[in-house]
Amino acid sequence: QTLEAFYNSIIHSNPLSVGLNCALGPKELESHLIELDRISEFFVSIHPNAGLPNAFGGYDETPESMAKFVKKWGESCYINIVGGCCGATPEHIKLMKKVTEKLKPRKRLQKVKHMRLSGLEAFNY
């Protein structure tokens, strides 16, 4: 299912936030975040892994490298809520907070009144 089709399937519940969590690191989640920013009438959250698991089951994304992604997303006003998932440590979270604490949050889009359907793909009419 595409991200927009998933979004269409949950908007009836009027969530506080729609977000991306786990499965991927910040580099791999970025294109999905940009798409979510484009379509979401709700706050946007993101909680990336500290990269993809390596051969030893660990995560190679450093706090500094994750903070660079988060800072870019914050400066682009893509996010309202940010955190970490698999492999993220207290140091990752500390740096995310530091790079975003003075940035303006993403503004919610105006609600669009039209039919939004979902299957594997979104259909908006």
Sequence positions of predicted segments:
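Domain-level signal for soluble alpha/beta catalytic cores
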Residues: 1-125
